[in-house]
Amino acid sequence: AVYSNPAGLAFMEDGFHLSFNGQSAFQTRTITSTFAPFAGFGGNATKVYKGEASAPFVPSVFAVYKKGDWAFSGSFAVTGGGGKATFNEGLGSFESQVSVIPMAMKAAGAGLVNGGLLPENPFANTDRYSVDSYMRGKQMIFGVQLGATYKITDYLSVFGGLRMNYVSNGYEGHIRDIQANIGDKMVNLNQTFAAYADQFNKLAAAAEVAGQPEAAKKYAAATAMATDYAGQTQDKYLDCDQTGWGVTPIIGADFKMGKWNVGVKYEFNTKLNVENKTRVDDTKLFAPGVNTPHDIPSLLTVGVSYEILPVLRASVGYHHFFDTHAKMADATNLITGERTGKQHFIDKGTNEYLAGIEWDVCKWAQISAGMQRTKYGVEDSYQSDMSFAVS
C-alpha cells in the first residue's frame, strides 16, 4: 500500500509497520529479424535472437508509522526499467551491418578489375560471412519514497509525497572476428583488407617512382578503399553506463466505507536525463558525456476493492501512463527518415488493466492471485531491438 495506495495508510492500526519483500524474475526475450543478407550466415534470412534475463532476488522495503489521523511512510524499491538481458549471439541491428559486406566486396572487386588494378575479381564468389557478436544490457530505476497521509473524515484520506528516482543503465558488447569466404576459405576481413591496403600502397608508390601518375592515382584510391574496409571490419567493443536522477511529486486519495475501498493516485511527470559514462565505444552510439532525455511519464492509478467475506477480498485496477508528455531518446521515423523523440511514436499512452483476489488462510498466512493486461499503443518507429515494448 505504501507504493500502490499510500492514501489508504490512514486506515491502518496505530503503530509501526514494516514490510521486507523479495521477488524473483526470469524471462526470455525473443527478437525475430528478417533480412535477406542474413542467409549468408547459416542459410536463413530470418534469425532469432534470444536474450536471457534473470533476477533471482529483487528486494524492496516499506515502512509506515501511524498515529491518530496521521501516517508517515517510506520505501525503497526497484520502481521501473527493463531489468537485465544478455544476448549471446548479439542483436540483428548489429549483425545486419556485417551481413551486407559480402555484396559490397563483390562490387568493390568488380571495380578493381574494371580499373585495371586486378586481373580478376577475388570476391566474385563471396556469399558467406560469420561474426562473433554479443550484447548485455540493463535498465533499472531505483526509487526512495517519503510521504504523509492524513485522514480528513472517517471515510476519506489524502496523501502527499515525493520519490527520488535514480536511473542506472548499462550496455556492454562486442562485434569481432568478422569473416567472409574468399573462394572456399573463410578469412578474417580486417586482416585481409589491411593486407590489400598495404599492397596497393606499395604499388602506388612504385607507380609514382616510375612516372605513372594515373596508375599511382588509381592505386591510391584502391588503398583508401581497402583501408576503409579494414576499418569497418575491425573488432568493435562497447562498454557504457548511463546514470541520472529526478524527483516525482505524488498525490493520492482514498475512500473507505463498509466493504468498499477506492484508492486513487497520481504521479507527476519526472524530468530526467541520463548521462553517458563511456569507457569504450567503437560503435559511435554512446559518445562520452552526452545527455539523453529519459523522463518518467506521469501516472494515474485507480483501484477498487470489495470485501466478499471477512477473509476474502477481490479488487480491480486501472493504470494510465501519460507517455506522450514525457521526453524520450530519439528514434527514426520509418516513413520520413526524420529523427525525433520516441514519445511522438506513441498513440495515447500505456493502459494497464488489473484484477486480483486475496484470501486470509489464517492469522499468519495470506495467499493471492491476479492478472494484468498491458497495452502500450506504440508505432513501429518506436521499436528497436535495443528498446522495445510488446503488449
Each model region followed by its residue ranges:
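N-terminal, post-signal peptide beta-strand-biased segments of exported outer-membrane/organellar beta-barrel
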Residues: 1-86, 100
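Outer-membrane beta-barrel porins/channels
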Residues: 57-58, 64-391
